[in-house]
C-alpha cells in the first residue's frame, strides 16, 4: 500500500536568531522566528510524513504552548515523527521538497540538506530531493520577510 502526504510551512525572518533550514545552519543576518528552532523545511517534511499516515501535524504532536519544545531541535522532532511512520509499518518511497525564499541563496546548502533529511528518514539520499525557488520579489517571501517550504512524500508498506 502506498500513501502520500503533503506539508507546508512558513516562518518570519527576524534579527537575532540563527537561520536553520533542512537541519543546516546557513550564514545570514536573520533567522527564522518560531517556538522551536523554526526549521521551516524540516517542519514541512515532518508535516508531510504525519499527513501520509493520518496523524495530524506537528502542532498536534509538538504544541508551541508546551515549554518542552521551546527552541527544540527540529531534526529530533523529525526523528520522532519518522518513528511514528515506522511504527505503522511504512518506509520512504521518496520525498520532494521546495524552499521558497528570495534570500539567502540556498543552492550551496542543498546537498547537505538532502543528506540530513535522508538521515532523519532513515533513507538513501537518492530518495530525497530539495530544490529552491524565489517568488520574483513578490509577496512576503519576495520581500525577504519570511521563508516558506513545501514537501510531498510517498511512503509504502515495508
Swiss-Prot record:
Keywords: Isoprene biosynthesis, Lyase, Metal-binding. GO terms for molecular function: 2-C-methyl-D-erythritol 2,4-cyclodiphosphate synthase activity; metal ion binding. A divalent metal cation binds at residues 9, 11, 43. The record marks 35, 134 as: Transition state stabilizer. PROSITE patterns: ISPF (PS01350). Disruption phenotype: Cells lacking this gene reveal a loss of rod shape, irregular septation, multicompartmentalized cells, and thickened cell walls. It also induces a decrease in isoprene production. This is 2-C-methyl-D-erythritol 2,4-cyclodiphosphate synthase. Transmembrane segments: none annotated. It catalyses: 4-CDP-2-C-methyl-D-erythritol 2-phosphate = 2-C-methyl-D-erythritol 2,4-cyclic diphosphate + CMP. Homotrimer. Involved in the biosynthesis of isopentenyl diphosphate (IPP) and dimethylallyl diphosphate (DMAPP), two major building blocks of isoprenoid compounds. Catalyzes the conversion of 4-diphosphocytidyl-2-C-methyl-D-erythritol 2-phosphate (CDP-ME2P) to 2-C-methyl-D-erythritol 2,4-cyclodiphosphate (ME-CPP) with a corresponding release of cytidine 5-monophosphate (CMP). 4-CDP-2-C-methyl-D-erythritol 2-phosphate binds at residues 9-11, 35-36, 57-59, 62-66, 101-107, 133-136, 140, 143. Its cofactor is a divalent metal cation. Pathway: Isoprenoid biosynthesis; isopentenyl diphosphate biosynthesis via DXP pathway; isopentenyl diphosphate from 1-deoxy-D-xylulose 5-phosphate: step 4/6. GO terms for biological process: isopentenyl diphosphate biosynthetic process, methylerythritol 4-phosphate pathway; terpenoid biosynthetic process. It is an enzyme of class 4 (lyase). It comes from Bacillus subtilis (strain 168). Belongs to the IspF family. Binds 1 divalent metal cation per subunit.
Amino acid at each position: 500500500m502506498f500513501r502520500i502526504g503533503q506539508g507546508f510551512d512558513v516562518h518570519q525572518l527576524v534579527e537575532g536568531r540563527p537561520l536553520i533550514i533542512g537541519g543546516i545552519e546557513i550564514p545570514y543576518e536573520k533567522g527564522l522566528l518560531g517556538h522551536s528552532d523554526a526549521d521551516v523545511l524540516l517542519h514541512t517534511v515532518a508535516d508531510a510524513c504525519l499527513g501520509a499516515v493520518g496523524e495530524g501535524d506537528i502542532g498536534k504532536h509538538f504544541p508551541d504552548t508546551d515549554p518542552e519544545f521551546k527552541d527544540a531541535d527540529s531534526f529530533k522532532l523529525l526523528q520522532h515523527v519518522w518513528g511514528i511512520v515506522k511504527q505503522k509499518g511504512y518506509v520512504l518511497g521518496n520525498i520532494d521538497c521546495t524552499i521558497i525564499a528570495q534570500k539567502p541563496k540556498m543552492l550551496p546548502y542543498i546537498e547537505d540538506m538532502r543528506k540530513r533529511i535522508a538521515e532523519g528518514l532513515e533513507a538513501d539520499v537518492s530518495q530525497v530531493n530539495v530544490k529552491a525557488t524565489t517568488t520574483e520579489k513578490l509577496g512576503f517571501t519576495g520581500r525577504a520577510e519570511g521563508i516558506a517550504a513545501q514537501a510531498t512524500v510517498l511512503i509504502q508498506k515495508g
